[in-house]
Amino acid sequence: ETALRAKIENTLCLEYPADKLEILVASDGSTDATDDIVREFEPRGVRLFRQEGRVGKTETHNNAVARANGEIVLFSDATTEYEPDVLRKLLPAFADESVGCVAGRLIYVDKASSNVGKGARSYWNYETFIKSAESKACSLIGASGCLYAVRKAAYQPMYAEACSDFLVCTMLYRQGLRSVFEPSAVCFEDTNHRPSDEMRMRVRVISQTYTDLWRNIDMMNPLQSGFFAVELISHKVLRYAVPLLLFALLISNILLARESVVFSIILAAQVFFYLLALAGWVLERIGVRLKFLVIPLYFVLANLASVIA
């Protein structure tokens, strides 16, 4: 509830003409004070859309977009803080009629200085690099859910199980529209600092993405979707296949260890790396944070999430 108040105040401070800005807060059957908080801001132009029945984020998005009046719909999360100029940075890209979505740059803030938070920031810096390259080469295959804008006329309702900020780029590409990355449009969000919270979040997102990839498997055919297919395969499919490759590497290494000292050393290095990750997990739970455990912990956490999903 505190985050929601701060989010609405932050949105009201955006540098954009008030008469051209509609702020719509979607509440998915909230049972706390969410709706009452939003109503407090109604005199300042904030609208409440209450979705009955707890249908989930994606269905709520679908129904909220149908009630929005603008030509461009900007999606956000209640926990995200925008820079005041995000709209002025995002919107010019829509002057290109081939652009259907513009995604901004998310910067994670690790207030707790946790190893999980540091790992998430490192991972996201790499993810941001990939997004920038995809945008220049062809099109984004996924946006950051806390900061992306879409042409309302091109938005299509999605099934409830979808990871909406990922699937939207595929749906737009089917219509011949690109999704681009605008790094100067910036938002901030706190990282998770507990391994269990980060694991839960990653499992949820990855399981939804698996569903989206399966339902859009035709888009992974380069003959149909060109370089977009290459991006989907390299960015998502191969990434989620890493645990299988790591398992195969470990098993083959075990079988070959007796044949060569080199293989024995490599096996020992693998086991040591996984032990470091385990130590990082245990120590993080009791509040002990060692910097050299950041990479092993988050690498194993992210790949374990792919397996669980």
Predicted regions and their residues:
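Acidic donor-binding/catalytic loop of UDP-sugar-dependent glycosyltransferases
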Residues: 2, 33, 76-93
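Hydrophobic targeting segments
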Residues: 4, 8-14, 21-26, 303
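Long helical/loop segments within the catalytic core of UDP-sugar-dependent glycosyltransferases
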Residues: 42, 49-50, 58-60, 84-162, ...
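A conserved acidic beta->alpha catalytic loop
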Residues: 13, 17, 27-36, 53, ...
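Acidic helix N-cap motif at the loop->helix transition within catalytic regions
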Residues: 2-6, 20, 31-40, 85
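Short aromatic/hydrophobic "clamp" motif used to bind/position activated sugar donors
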Residues: 73
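Membrane-embedded multi-pass helical conduit in multi-pass membrane proteins
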Residues: 189, 239-309
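Catalytic donor/gating beta->alpha subdomain of glycosyltransferases that bind UDP-sugars
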Residues: 94-127, 160, 164-235, 304-308
